């Protein structure tokens, strides 16, 4: 006889922060009767999802990858940004074996060192300080042909803010005496994660052949021309930068290609296009044999040297539930599916025993302000059915809308996104009530609560460092103040009556009144 489950659901409202300032605050201005009622009726508070509380530098805004690793592991996880920055400060970076080997082999063969990555101070997918350290190290080890392929941000930074970074690197290469910016392209193309290979192919052709929609003799000139075409940083068309003789850079056999993004999800597709022999996402005109190095581990099936391999996290929530014979479901749309699976499980691809997964396809639109509800209705249909099936002890669900629509900078669309999510939460809470289940509602980081930059007046498309909501829809309870994302997994185990493993340093935040 099958035991009926009374599930605990964790609803992660991506990009849903709390901000006192109501100006251009899409969450405040949205009509959210369900969340208003739940906040009035149940125990609630605010927790931290940024900075030192999630293993990032002090004051650094949170992000989805970091947030889900902390949520799932039940401990503050030392993030790649902090780890690599520390290695640079300690002069360990310049001795990194994977990076040194790639440079040395290229130099010995008379080849070039190509460095690609998101040229941004955003700190979400990369940091330009890391890219600078790599350029300096390559020249210091004897490389005379150093080519930087700059992916432009405008998403975790203001929409038109790349000029300072490009100017800085022009000056850097002048100071070093070798190297140059070889190409620029928006992250929309180079860092797609939704199998839109027509975008990725443009970045691939640009890096391998110097084949581009536009050609300029200077990166800042190329950027200014993009702005004239009304392209913000994120959407800058492929632009090859020529040398003093009018030649473009190309990727050749024996060259080194070093990918300086440290976050995995938006690095995987373009990486596979370079290294997979059986790659079929698009027709590759050339397939140069290069020494490809990734800064961190992007996926278990990506076979390339890794400068900073992942630290092994044991006894994450998923693993503990498996070891205790519990069942669990992970569910989200394409855009955040990796976050409720790979990242929530501490960087492990394979599901745990008793872990089911449901992937809902995100809508195929150019930008999500065109469909702010995304696939939330279908996602909720599947989630409600899973609750009603009484198969699961724990359900982890991510609603991507607040973040994905927040990133577009479209205030009205972000309001609609929040309203769509609120309606879905109502359905989920009702379904849980019918089976005696309980629910924690929180977020991984802020975004939609700030849709304009108060200083520049530009659209605010980045994450924030605001606190995020923490609501317990269940038994009468109190919630501790001062919580953080790493307290969520221990809280779930505590509510289930399970012991918390020693590796989880977070503390239960919810205390049920007897």
Swiss-Prot record:
Q: How is the cofactor bound?
A: Binds 2 manganese ions per subunit.
Active-site residues, record numbering mapped to chain: 64 (phosphoserine intermediate)
Give the source's domain of life in one word.
Bacteria
Q: Which gene encodes it?
A: gpmI
Organism annotation: Shewanella sp. (strain MR-4)
This molecule's function is given as: Catalyzes the interconversion of 2-phosphoglycerate and 3-phosphoglycerate.
Q: How does it assemble?
A: Monomer.
Keywords for this entry? Glycolysis, Isomerase, Manganese, Metal-binding
From the UniProt record, give the pathway where this protein acts.
Carbohydrate degradation; glycolysis; pyruvate from D-glyceraldehyde 3-phosphate: step 3/5
- Name of the protein in question: 2,3-bisphosphoglycerate-independent phosphoglycerate mutase
């Amino acid at each position: 006889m099958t035991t009926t489950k009374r599930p605990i659901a964790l609803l992660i409202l991506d990009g849903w922060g709390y901000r006192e300032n109501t100006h251009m605050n899409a969450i405040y201005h949205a009509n959210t009767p369900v969340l208003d009622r739940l906040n009035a009726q149940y125990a609630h508070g605010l927790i931290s999802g940024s900075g030192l509380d999630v293993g990032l530098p002090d004051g650094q805004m949170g992000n989805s990858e970091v947030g889900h690793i902390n949520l799932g592991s039940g401990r503050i996880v030392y993030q790649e940004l902090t780890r690599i920055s520390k290695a640079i400060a300690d002069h360990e970076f310049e001795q990194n074996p994977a990076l040194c080997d790639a440079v040395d082999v290229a130099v010995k063969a008379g080849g070039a060192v190509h460095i690609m990555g998101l040229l941004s101070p955003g700190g979400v997918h990369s940091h330009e300080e890391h890219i600078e350290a790599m350029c300096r190290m390559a020249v210091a080890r004897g490389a005379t042909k150093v080519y930087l392929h700059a992916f432009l941000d405008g998403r975790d930074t203001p929409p038109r803010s790349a000029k300072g970074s490009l100017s800085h690197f022009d000056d850097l290469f002048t100071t070093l005496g070798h190297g140059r910016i070889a190409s620029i392209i928006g992250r929309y193309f180079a860092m797609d994660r939704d199998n839109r290979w027509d975008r990725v192919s443009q970045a691939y052709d640009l890096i391998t052949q110097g084949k581009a929609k536009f050609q300029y003799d200077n990166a800042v000139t190329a950027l200014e021309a993009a702005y004239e075409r009304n392209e913000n940083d994120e959407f800058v068309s492929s632009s090859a930068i020529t040398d003093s003789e009018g030649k473009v850079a190309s990727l050749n056999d024996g060259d080194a290609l070093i990918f300086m993004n440290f976050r995995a999800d938006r690095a995987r597709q373009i990486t596979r296009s370079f290294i997979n022999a059986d790659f079929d996402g698009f027709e590759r005109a050339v397939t140069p044999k290069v020494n490809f190095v990734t800064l961190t581990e992007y996926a278990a099936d990506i076979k390339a040297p890794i400068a900073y391999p992942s630290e092994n996290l044991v006894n994450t929530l998923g693993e503990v539930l498996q070891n205790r014979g519990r069942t669990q479901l992970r569910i989200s749309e394409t855009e955040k599916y990796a976050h409720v699976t790979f990242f929530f499980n501490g960087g492990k691809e394979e599901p745990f025993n008793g872990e089911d997964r449901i992937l809902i396809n995100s809508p195929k639109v150019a930008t999500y302000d065109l469909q702010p509800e995304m696939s939330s209705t279908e996602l909720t249909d599947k989630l409600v059915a899973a609750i009603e099936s009484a198969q699961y002890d724990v359900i982890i669900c991510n609603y991507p809308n607040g973040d994905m629509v927040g990133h577009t900078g479209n205030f009205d669309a972000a309001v609609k996104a929040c309203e769509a999510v609120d309606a879905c939460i109502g359905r989920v809470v009702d379904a849980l009530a019918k089976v005696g289940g309980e629910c924690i509602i929180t977020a991984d980081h802020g975004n939609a609560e700030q849709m304009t930059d108060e200083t520049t007046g530009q659209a605010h498309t980045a994450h924030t460092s605001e606190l995020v909501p923490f609501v317990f829809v269940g038994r009468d309870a109190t919630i501790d103040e001062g919580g953080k994302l790493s307290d969520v997994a221990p809280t779930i185990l505590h509510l289930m009556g399970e012991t918390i493993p020693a590796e989880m340093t977070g503390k239960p935040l919810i205390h049920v009144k007897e």
